[in-house]
Amino acid sequence: MKSIYITGYMGAGKTTIGKALSKELHMDVVDTDQKIEEKQEKAILDIFAEEGEMAFREYESEMLRSLPVRNAIITTGGGIIEREENRKWMKENGIVVYLYCDPHVIAERLREDTTRPLFQKKDIDAFVTKFESRQAYYEEAHIHIDTTNKSVKQIMNELKEKINE
């Protein structure tokens, strides 16, 4: 089976759904952010602070191309879709799933999370603007799932149905 790339904005449920799908399909799950942290030997927050977003995006593209294109669930960072080369790679080499969640619901989820470099609690308007600027890129995915106020079980049922279509 082709690899499944799970995309969506931060806080949409990519990691949670990736792990659940991994168990369901008996496929390994690989998190691009985690792999970048391992390879660079520093937290993403530190990469952003010390090297900037452009360097991080370069690491992200390199990591994406190094991952398996078969029999893996790949959970991506929220901004991976900003580069056309990444969107093209994922679409050509796997099934791309977009997990949508209302940005105001995400903001509530992330309110206390200090590990997200692009989420600033004080500036919800900028957060929503960033979300909207990525929307068209996310929508290029093969499969769209709205995770807003849904349980993992509901999301998984919908996702399995769409994967099997």
Swiss-Prot record:
Main location, first listed in the record: cytoplasm
Free-text comment on the cofactor: Binds 1 Mg(2+) ion per subunit.
Keyword entries, A-Z: Amino-acid biosynthesis, Aromatic amino acid biosynthesis, ATP-binding, Cytoplasm, Kinase, Magnesium, Metal-binding, Nucleotide-binding, Transferase
Enzyme superclass (EC): transferase
Biological process annotations from GO: amino acid biosynthetic process; aromatic amino acid family biosynthetic process; chorismate biosynthetic process
Cellular localization per UniProt: Cytoplasm
Residues bound to Mg(2+): T15
One GO cellular component, as annotated: cytosol
Reaction(s) this enzyme catalyzes, per UniProt: shikimate + ATP = 3-phosphoshikimate + ADP + H(+)
Pathway: Metabolic intermediate biosynthesis; chorismate biosynthesis; chorismate from D-erythrose 4-phosphate and phosphoenolpyruvate: step 5/7
Record flagged with keyword Cytoplasm: yes
PANTHER family per record: SHIKIMATE KINASE (PTHR21087), SHIKIMATE KINASE 1, CHLOROPLASTIC (PTHR21087:SF16)
Function: Catalyzes the specific phosphorylation of the 3-hydroxyl group of shikimic acid using ATP as a cosubstrate.
HAMAP family membership: Shikimate_kinase (MF_00109)
Oligomeric form and interacting partners: Monomer.
Protein name stated in the entry: Shikimate kinase
